[in-house]
């Protein structure tokens, strides 16, 4: 990727407009998961170290454009940053479109960009106002790189300099390493509830990976495609022909045993059985021990591992063993030299639950952007940075 990088630029005295991803869950004014803020702090520290005048902004929630509501304010993020080890004061500015004073040794958080009229439609006039605030635009929000909005795309067209922040640069490098030039054997694990939302991903990965592993509702379709009864399990029957086509082009191991329950609840009893024994009133909520161990064996022999989605309903204690075995196998393979990359909300939750965050080579912060990159789609925010780097 030929883009300018913030880390390579002279930032002394320069006004920086950093578009970060600070879209964190907030409940009653309190942040319930700080992962995205923690990921952004090194970028802010680097900007301060390099003597920049730092402005940072993000979207948060889904506000109505032109309407300010406290529920969508970045104030909780400001409070978090002030309590962190940044070592400089952090202040929130709500009205900034006509200019904002920013000094070295402080951070100015510009209020939620989605409150500004024209943000989502990439209005050129709004983009020019953003660009006028800065000397350098830093795109560091990979999670929104697939959206051409004012704060992710438009500003990059008009800012004097447009570059990638450390997070975005690392993300593109890690994804490139896993997908463009993977060490082989390359393994892709795709789980989750709906196969229709991940069909293009499966299709793209089937052309790159030496082996595909499917889990969750996606695996149920492959089980059904082999002629087994999946009972009341979540699956999309109309996609069975597609599953058969994929299975004919790539080796996809189908579970031989599963854990079933008769209700979708935390207290449901888990029964382990062969896939051929699932009854009409049962639902598959996890893979069985034999299947999990077989998959763990495959994982441990891989040199590149791409992981998106759990293999069972790991949120329920009775149905998390499969995902736990898979998670630990990925951690072990990584410890033995494999390059592993993981992404997607459920995957990150599983990584946290099983305490393996420091045992995965790279954890992607982008959900939709992560999958669109895998599908081979052009990410608008990256495309404009490349264009500006070469103009």
Swiss-Prot record:
Enzyme category, top tier: transferase
Keywords: ATP-binding, Cytoplasm, Glycolysis, Kinase, Nucleotide-binding, Transferase
Protein residues bound to ATP: 198, 315, 344-347
Pathways involved: Carbohydrate degradation; glycolysis; pyruvate from D-glyceraldehyde 3-phosphate: step 2/5
GO cellular component, one term: cytosol
Chief location of this protein within or outside the cell: cytoplasm
Protein localization: Cytoplasm
Entry-linked Gene3D superfamilies: Phosphoglycerate kinase, N-terminal domain
Single Gene Ontology BP annotation: glycolytic process
InterPro entries per UniProt: Phosphoglycerate_kinase, Phosphoglycerate_kinase_N, Phosphoglycerate_kinase_sf
Pfam families assigned: PGK
Binding site for substrate: 21-23, 36, 59-62, 114, 147
Reactions accelerated catalytically: (2R)-3-phosphoglycerate + ATP = (2R)-3-phospho-glyceroyl phosphate + ADP
Assigned EC number: 2.7.2.3
GO MF entry, a single one: phosphoglycerate kinase activity
Family named by the database record: Belongs to the phosphoglycerate kinase family.
PANTHER family given in the database record: PHOSPHOGLYCERATE KINASE, PHOSPHOGLYCERATE KINASE 1, CHLOROPLASTIC-RELATED
Subunit composition and interactions: Monomer.
Record's protein name: Phosphoglycerate kinase
């Amino acid at each position: 990727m030929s883009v300018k990088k913030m880390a390579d630029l002279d930032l002394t005295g320069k006004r920086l407009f950093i578009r970060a991803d600070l879209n964190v869950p907030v409940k009653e004014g309190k942040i319930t998961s700080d992962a995205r803020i923690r990921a952004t702090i090194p970028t802010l520290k680097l900007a301060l170290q390099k003597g920049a005048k730092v402005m940072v902004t993000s979207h948060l929630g889904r506000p109505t454009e032109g309407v300010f509501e406290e529920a969508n304010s970045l104030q909780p993020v400001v409070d978090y940053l002030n309590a962190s080890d940044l070592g400089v004061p952090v202040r929130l500015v709500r009205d900034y479109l006509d200019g904002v004073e920013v000094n070295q040794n402080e951070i100015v958080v510009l209020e939620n960009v989605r409150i500004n009229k024209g943000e989502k439609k990439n209005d050129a006039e709004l983009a020019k106002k953003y660009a006028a605030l800065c000397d350098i635009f830093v795109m560091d929000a990979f999670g929104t790189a697939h959206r051409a909005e004012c704060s992710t795309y438009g500003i990059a067209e008009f800012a004097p300099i447009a570059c990638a922040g450390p997070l975005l640069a690392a993300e593109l490098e890690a994804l490139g390493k896993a997908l463009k030039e993977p060490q082989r054997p390359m393994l892709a694990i795709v789980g989750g509830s709906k196969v229709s939302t991940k069909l293009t991903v499966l299709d793209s990965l089937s052309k790159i990976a030496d082996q595909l592993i499917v889990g969750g509702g996606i695996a149920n379709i492959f089980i059904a495609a082999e002629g087994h009864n999946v009972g009341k399990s979540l699956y999309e029957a109309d996609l069975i022909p597609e599953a058969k086509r994929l299975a004919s082009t790539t080796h996809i191991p189908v579970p031989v045993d599963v854990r079933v329950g008769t209700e979708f609840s935390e207290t449901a009893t888990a029964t382990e059985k062969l896939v051929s024994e699932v009854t009409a009133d049962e639902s598959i909520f996890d893979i069985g021990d034999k299947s999990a161990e077989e998959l763990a064996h495959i994982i441990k022999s891989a040199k590149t591992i791409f992981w998106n989605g759990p293999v069972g309903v790991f949120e329920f204690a009775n149905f998390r063993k499969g995902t736990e075995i898979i998670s630990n196998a990925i951690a072990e393979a990584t410890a033995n030299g494999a390059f592993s990359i993981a992404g997607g909300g459920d995957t990150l939750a599983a990584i946290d639950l099983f305490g393996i965050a420091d045992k995965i080579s790279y954890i992607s912060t982008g959900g939709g952007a992560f999958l669109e990159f895998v599908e081979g789609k052009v990410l608008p925010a990256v495309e404009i940075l490349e264009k500006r780097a070469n103009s």
